[in-house]
Each structure stands twice: as C-alpha cells, then as structure tokens.
Regions:
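Terminal amphipathic alpha-helical/low-complexity segments used for targeting or macromolecular assembly
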Residues: 1-7, 12-13, 18-19, 55, ...
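Structural signal for interior beta-strand "rungs" in well-ordered beta-sheet cores
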Residues: 3-189
C-alpha cells in the first residue's frame, strides 16, 4: 500500500504505486497515475490526466498537470506525461497540453527542474536536461536531450533548443537554438559551441572539432542557410556526431538564432 500522509487528499480513482509516497496536505486528482518509487512532498498538487513514471521526486508547492494558460483551451481532456527519475523542486509548474496541438505535455527521463521553473502546454522536454531557477518555456516549445537552461532564461512559443545546447542566464530565446550551441543575451544570440558540456559527456576532441567546424560553417563563413546545411550534411557523412545538427536544420521552425 502507498505511503500516504493522513492529511493528503488522494482521489480514490487515482492510481498510486504501492511504494510511492504522498506528503502532507498534497492533493492528487482522479485522473492521476503515479509510478513506483515516486516521492511527492508536502503541499503538492497533481491534477488532470497526468501520468508520472518511476522514481520521480516532487518537492513542496509544485503544481503538475493543471489546465493550460491558453485562451483557446475549452476544457478538452488533454494530458501531461512524465517519465522516470526526474526531480521537480519547489514551485515548479507543468501544464497540460491543448487540443490545438499535441494534446499532451511530455517530459522524458532524468531531468532536473529547479525552483520556480515552468513548462507550458504542449511542450516536449527530452532527457537529462537542467532547468535552472526561474527558467521558463512557453507553449509548444521543444527542448532536446542534455540542454541546460540558465536561470531566468526563457524560450518563445514554438521555439526549439537542440541537443547539448546551453542557454545562458537571463537569455530570451526568440528563435531556434541549433544543437551544441551556446546562446546568451536579450535577445539571445549564438556565442560558440558548448565545448565544456560536450567534454563532460564524453565527446572526444575530434568530435568536438567537427562540431566547431559545423558551427563555423553555420555562423562564421557568411554562407546562406541552405549552403551551410549542405556543407554540414556533407561533413556528417564522415562525422556522425553532426547527425543531430543535420536533422535539426532540416526541420522548418522559427528560424535559427542569429
């Protein structure tokens, strides 16, 4: 039987794993599913059609799965899906999707959301990302694996941030951030590649060199985007580390940050 504090309000229709924990004064709604080993602290609200996987930890005053902050939302049965091994610190808010897009807000595995961070409706967050304090992403944003969002940074709706990118503190991201890129400023502009992050994750010197060459083609050689994409795609034939960048640039979005 789940470890539920006597003051917690858990709807009988909620599905809570036998070894999950729900802290004092927390509220768990009828459509919620909580996986094995997940720990929900005191004063947490989990509501809506929300599925939370295994071994997550949710700290006090977080709000997970509530309706989106979107004028178009009309009460549709949209969802929030959270994977395994995530940490949500104090006052984190994660909102459900909308019928106008995916209908689901999705968070992968192994992510760390520090205090006061926000994930809006229909966002897709990958794996092993870090959202520093007060980082916020608007609706329909995609954050790929291993991204680091600096404190007080934000991403405009429909924006994309590619794998291993780093968004600096206070940065306002109005476009798409290519994989491996570091951006900062208001509005955010590119400032090289995330070399230190790549080293920490086991990339070799040769792989990092290929990433830097691709960045140079994209931003430093005065090439059109089409020509830069072609050059990077050609390099990727012998440098598979560039495959995520090739795939990212092939998808039309808000346009890459400049």
């Amino acid at each position: 039987m789940a470890h539920i504090h006597p003051t917690a309000l858990v709807d009988p229709a909620a599905r809570v794993a036998a070894d999950a924990m729900v802290g004092a004064y927390s509220i768990i709604g009828a459509g919620v599913e909580i996986g094995e080993g997940t720990i929900i602290g005191p004063h947490v609200v989990v509501t809506g059609r929300t599925a939370i996987g295994k071994r997550n930890r949710i700290f006090q005053f977080a709000s997970i799965g509530d309706i989106p902050q979107d004028r178009k939302y009309g009460g549709e049965p949209t969802t929030t899906t959270i994977g395994d091994d995530n940490v949500f610190r104090e006052y984190v808010s994660i909102h459900a999707g909308t019928a106008q897009d995916r209908g689901d807000t999705k968070i992968g595995n192994g992510n760390l959301f520090l205090a006061y961070t926000h994930v809006a409706h229909d966002c897709v967050v990958g794996n092993f990302t870090t959202f520093s304090n007060n980082a916020q992403i608007a609706g329909h944003v995609r954050i790929d694996d291993w991204v680091v969002m600096g404190a007080y940074s934000g991403v405009h709706q429909f924006g994309r941030v590619g794998v291993h990118a780093m968004v600096g503190t206070f940065a306002a991201v109005l476009g798409d951030v290519p994989p491996f890129t570091t951006v900062s400023g208001f509005p955010a502009k590119p400032h090289g590649t995330n070399n230190e992050g790549l080293r920490r994750r086991g990339f070799t010197s040769d792989q990092i060199l290929e990433v830097r060459r691709a960045y140079k083609a994209l931003y430093r050689e005065n090439l059109t985007l089409e020509d830069a994409r072609a050059k990077i795609a050609a390099a990727a034939v012998n440098a598979p580390v560039l495959a995520p960048l090739v795939e990212f640039l092939a998808v039309p979005g808000r346009g890459i940050v400049r």
